[in-house]
């Protein structure tokens, strides 16, 4: 894979905002290995406007100035339209997500056997087939892409995510009055289906009678999408959103973090290492992970890294209690 980047002239294209963690990670990789690189990205808050801005720039770029094009987030939105422009350069892709898997199997926007589902599957397959090298976020995802889309296994390479350690690092914070002596259990996330928010909230419900446990949930919960109403209790705090610097302070304050993923039936949840896990690792916080192949690629069971059966709130509740009893406040 490195032969396509090392000492090469690279054009990096991403449809995600430039400061997105995966972009900064890959740009740092280019900084280290490429002879020089150019970034085509956009800061538009509107995704359609961002795409149009990128497309306009691509129409005017001179590809004879580059050896390699590196397609960052969502290469499916670029390669099908501009393959003609990239025919004389090597193509590296970050296949961070499958459109088919995300929209049909994870978020269930379309049926897999529908016209759109089949089209998304074809776009994923063709995008993968045209690459000389493909970055995946886990070995588990690489295996899935090879099996589901017939991607060449020899072209698939794993680049794990990492946390932004300028924000997420060990720190000490003072607890609010009333939380001294309590065990704070924290969940934070963007509340995507694969994360398993219903499992987390059911776990809070099972444990809300423990006076010395305090639960904090940070993320934009949509109540209408929950299987059951969210539990309400004096020992449960909900926060819709926090800037990253403030989120880091809450993580530092927590005793135990629920990293996930916890959904029991979405396949993608078993092939992905949650960003939460990388953040907790960077901040040296105890965490509970979903018991799946992807998480086991990087993490081993220990006193402060626990695995739990996915889709089972009772198992998660028992794991929290067991950890709490070993680490009394």
Tell me the role of every PLM-derived stretch.
Residues 188, 214-227:
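Glycosyltransferase donor-sugar binding loop
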Residues 251-270:
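Acidic donor-binding loop of glycosyltransferase active sites
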Residues 11, 177-195, 201-205, 215-216:
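Conserved donor-binding/catalytic core segment of Leloir-type glycosyltransferases
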Residues 301-312, 322-328:
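Conserved acidic donor-binding segment of nucleotide-sugar-dependent glycosyltransferases
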Residues 55-59, 99, 114-134:
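Membrane-proximal helix-turn-helix segments that form the acceptor-binding/catalytic region
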Residues 140, 161-162:
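Carbohydrate-associated surface elements
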Residues 146, 162-177, 196, 227:
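Acidic anion/phosphate-binding donor-loop and adjacent secondary structure
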Residues 225-256:
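Nucleotide-activated donor-binding/catalytic signature segment of Leloir-type glycosyltransferases, i.e.
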């Amino acid at each position: 894979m490195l032969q396509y980047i090392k000492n090469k002239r690279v054009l990096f294209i991403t449809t995600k905002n430039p400061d997105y963690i995966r972009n900064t990670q890959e740009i740092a990789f280019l900084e280290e290995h490429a002879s020089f690189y150019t970034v085509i990205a956009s800061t538009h808050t509107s995704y359609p406007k961002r795409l149009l801005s990128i497309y306009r720039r691509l129409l005017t770029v001179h590809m004879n100035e580059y050896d390699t094009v590196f397609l960052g987030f969502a290469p499916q939105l670029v390669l099908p339209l501009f393959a003609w422009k990239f025919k004389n350069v090597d193509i590296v892709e970050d296949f961070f997500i499958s459109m088919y898997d995300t929209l049909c199997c994870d978020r269930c926007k379309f049926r897999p056997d529908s016209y759109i589902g089949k089209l998304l599957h074809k776009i994923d397959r063709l995008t993968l087939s045209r690459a000389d090298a493909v970055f995946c976020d886990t070995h588990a995802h690489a295996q899935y892409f090879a099996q589901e889309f017939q991607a060449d296994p020899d072209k698939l390479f794993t680049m794990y995510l990492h946390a932004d350690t300028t924000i997420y690092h060990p720190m000490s914070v003072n607890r609010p009055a009333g939380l001294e002596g309590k065990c704070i259990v924290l969940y934070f996330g963007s509340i995507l289906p694969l994360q398993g928010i219903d499992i987390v909230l059911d776990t809070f419900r099972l444990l809300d009678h423990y006076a010395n446990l305090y639960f904090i949930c940070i993320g934009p919960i949509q109540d209408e999408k929950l299987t059951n109403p969210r539990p309400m209790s004096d020992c449960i705090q909900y926060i819709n959103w926090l800037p990253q610097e403030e989120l880091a302070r809450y993580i530092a304050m927590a005793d135990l973090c629920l990293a996930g993923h916890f959904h029991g039936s979405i396949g993608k949840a078993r092939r992905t290492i949650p960003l939460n896990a990388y953040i907790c690792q960077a901040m040296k916080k105890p965490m509970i992970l979903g018991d799946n192949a992807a998480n086991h690629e990087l993490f081993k069971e220990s006193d402060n890294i626990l695995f739990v059966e996915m889709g089972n709130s009772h198992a998660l509740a028992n794991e929290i209690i067991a950890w709490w009893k070993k680490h009394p406040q």
